[in-house]
Amino acid sequence: MKIVVDENIPLADALFGDLGEIIRKPGREISSADVAEADALLVRSVTRVNADLLTGSKVKFVGTCTIGTDHLDKEFLAEAGIRFASAPGCNAQGVVQYDLAALAHLGYLARDIRVGIIGCGNVGGSLHRALTGMGVTCVCYDPFLTQDQNADLADWDALFTCDVICVHTPLTRSGPYPTHHMLSTPFFRAMRDGALLLNAGRGEVIDNRALKAYLQGDNSNHLSVVLDVWEGEPAIDAELAPLVKIATPHIAGYSFEGKTNGSLMIYEALAEFLGVNATERSARVAAVKAQAYGAAEPLDADDLVTAILATHPITRDDKALRDQLDQLPAGFDALRKGYPVRREFSHYQLTSAQIPANVTALGFSLDSAK
């Protein structure tokens, strides 16, 4: 069989090589001609998978190595009898690491703060657990959850009591709670004075034009902003980026583990679709995982902020995007393609006796001999 694979999907040979012939393509450039004779298509969020791409092709399986699925026309896939799979939660810990690195760099973790989280699914829920494990008070807004599922659920207006609001919703344009442009000028105005708005979910959830106008209107003292996701990627608004505190090229979930987990989850789905037995699938996943992840790395840090920023030097990513603002849209994609290896908290064993035990809530391990 032929498997067309986004060239940025890691471990493609190790995982999919025995299942068929691998044909690598740049994700944004995958065309109907590329997939005409393919049996399976493996993508990331940059590839629009719809009738225009797949009509007339032999594709019977589509896998996206991402949490989000708004780039897939799921209705078309179902009608066409094409199986599809995603990787929910694959990079949740990488996004949590990004959020905490932003808060650490901007000084919020050194203060007594109240954090609002919009959307408490895989990513938002992981962030909620990490923050509460650190003793941070959280306010969660998610109309699809109940109080039994999340004790910190609150109504929309409770968000405006928060010092920080983190956005982790999917992108939806219909249904009872559409998220497209959910946050615009009235929301910005209602936020607490000096608050931080952080979006590492989907760019279109925030009206970027309205945000730019608000920040250009001398409201930067009222509102600080961190953006990892943008409307119109990769052709983002180069005039908005200089107005925010941290600007990065959609790499929050680009941890090594996050990308690897996505590949592993889609391998499981494709192999099952092809009839590979569970024992063989599990053995392949275990072998690839052990080789890819390796042993824990010691990290000497005397406090939590230092530890977090040692694992994710977020100012590096911010500078990289600012340096490419005159090279958009190509520069945006180049940064994502060439993103350096970033390991999650779980890869590190903290060796300092000064570090608080609650860092294990983030996934760090502690040196038992300390």
Swiss-Prot record:
Key word Ubl conjugation present: no
Residues the entry annotates as binding NAD(+): 142, 169, 228, 253
Enzyme Commission number(s): 1.1.1.290
InterPro entries recorded: D-isomer_2_OHA_DH_cat_dom, D-isomer_DH_CS, D-isomer_DH_NAD-bd, Erythronate-4-P_DHase, Erythronate-4-P_DHase_dimer, NAD(P)-bd_dom_sf, PdxB_dimer_sf
Broad EC category: oxidoreductase
Gene3D superfamilies: 3.30.1370.170, NAD(P)-binding Rossmann-like Domain
Reactions catalysed according to its record: 4-phospho-D-erythronate + NAD(+) = (R)-3-hydroxy-2-oxo-4-phosphooxybutanoate + NADH + H(+)
Residues that hold substrate according to the record: 45, 66, 254
Pathway field: Cofactor biosynthesis; pyridoxine 5'-phosphate biosynthesis; pyridoxine 5'-phosphate from D-erythrose 4-phosphate: step 2/5
Alphabetical UniProt keywords: Cytoplasm, NAD, Oxidoreductase, Pyridoxine biosynthesis
GO CC, any one term: cytosol
GO MF entry, a single one: 4-phosphoerythronate dehydrogenase activity
Keyword Oxidoreductase included in the entry's annotation: yes
Domain of life: Bacteria
Known role: Catalyzes the oxidation of erythronate-4-phosphate to 3-hydroxy-2-oxo-4-phosphonooxybutanoate.
Subunit structure: Homodimer.
Family: Belongs to the D-isomer specific 2-hydroxyacid dehydrogenase family. PdxB subfamily.
Protein's UniProt name: Erythronate-4-phosphate dehydrogenase
Lineage: Bacteria, Pseudomonadati, Pseudomonadota, Gammaproteobacteria, Cellvibrionales
Name of the gene encoding the protein in the UniProt record: pdxB
